Amino acid sequence: MILYFSATGTNKYVAEQIAKAIDEKIVPLKELVRQKKYSITVPEGENFGVVMPTYWEGLPAILLDYLQKAEILLEGADHYCYFVATYGCDYGNVLSTAQKEFGKVGIQFDSLYAARFVDNWSPMFYLKNAERNRRAEENGEAETRII
């Protein structure tokens, strides 16, 4: 299972690429919130991945709010848990923050990754440089393949 949040499509793309590579299903966080589903059960032997954007070097509010209400149950003992943060400029302490926040609900990540893509927060960054954006997208895709 890969839990993801994507406001612009980047994280959905990353989650889909990982899911395709390891034959996992993706679960949009927005749907869990909309359905008020705050309990997740991960069957024994299934991986648990999380793909999130970096917001101001931290986690999105929708995820932090969800984790305050969530119960995540890993059945059995055979799980590989990982977290992927996408970012455009700097990912700051998002990986250690993810480890801390998910630790509060009993999840310890085996691996933490950061993949750089185009920074798409338009009030702060100039997005019209097609060549720069193309290079950033290629970089993000290459980093996603490594993950």
Predicted feature residues:
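FMN-binding flavodoxin-like domain, especially the glycine-rich phosphate-binding loop
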Residues: 1-2, 6-14, 18-34, 38-147
